[in-house]
């Protein structure tokens, strides 16, 4: 087991997969004449500093906010920070951002004031990870006039998603619940 640990340390120190992956993306973008924003989230944040909205970086997952009180009750954060400019990710050349809704999800807040027809439950795919908001699943469904809320969050699994469904179903009473299950990480 020591040799496996040493191998992991060696790979971590001497082989930076993330860096190689980024270089490949930059190379492909250049070949396709795509202007790729290479700024880090911190550099992007510094560029928009002074904005009236608070900024939060995506990646604060549910496990970071599990709290127990003295009665052994567990409090679990179901969404992100509400009504906040969220810097999400950059996988395809631009930094994806959105203003979260009143419950911290990637929805236009005014949708909560409508009769909801559909809710989407899932992980980063439903969240709209690294996709412009007008291209994500819920925006596409909304563009056809079917009021839809997305309760997708990257890094969540079926139990967390069930908790989201139990909490927000009663607020929305939709006609349809559409559950996205991804076999590779759920």
Residue ranges with predicted function:
Residues 1-11:
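Hydrophobic membrane-insertion alpha-helices, especially the h-region
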Residues 10, 39, 64, 185-186:
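Intrinsically disordered, low-complexity regions of eukaryotic proteins
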Residues 12, 84-86, 97, 148, ...:
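Residue-identity detector for threonine
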Residues 12-15, 180:
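Hydrophobic or amphipathic alpha-helical targeting/insertion segments
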Residues 19-143:
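Membrane/wall-proximal cationic-aromatic binding patches
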Residues 92, 118-119, 127-186:
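Conserved SGNH/GDSL esterase-like catalytic core that processes O-acyl groups on lipids
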């Amino acid at each position: 087991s020591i040799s496996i640990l040493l191998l992991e340390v060696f790979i971590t120190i001497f082989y930076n997969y993330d860096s190689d992956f980024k270089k490949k993306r930059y190379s492909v973008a250049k070949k396709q004449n795509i202007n790729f924003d290479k700024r880090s989230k911190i550099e992007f944040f510094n560029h928009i500093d002074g904005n009236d909205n608070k900024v939060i970086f995506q990646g604060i997952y549910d496990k970071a906010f599990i709290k127990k009180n003295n009665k052994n009750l567990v409090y679990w954060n179901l969404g992100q920070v509400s009504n906040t400019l969220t810097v999400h990710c950059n996988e395809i050349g631009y930094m994806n951002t959105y203003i979260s809704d009143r419950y911290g999800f990637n929805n236009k807040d005014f949708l909560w004031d409508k009769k909801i027809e559909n809710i989407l439950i899932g992980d980063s795919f439903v969240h709209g990870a690294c996709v412009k908001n007008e291209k994500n699943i819920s925006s596409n469904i909304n563009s056809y006039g079917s009021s839809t809320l997305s309760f997708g969050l990257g890094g969540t699994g079926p139990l967390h998603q069930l908790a989201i469904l139990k909490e927000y179903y009663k607020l929305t009473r939709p006609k349809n619940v559409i559950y996205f299950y991804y076999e590779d990480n759920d």
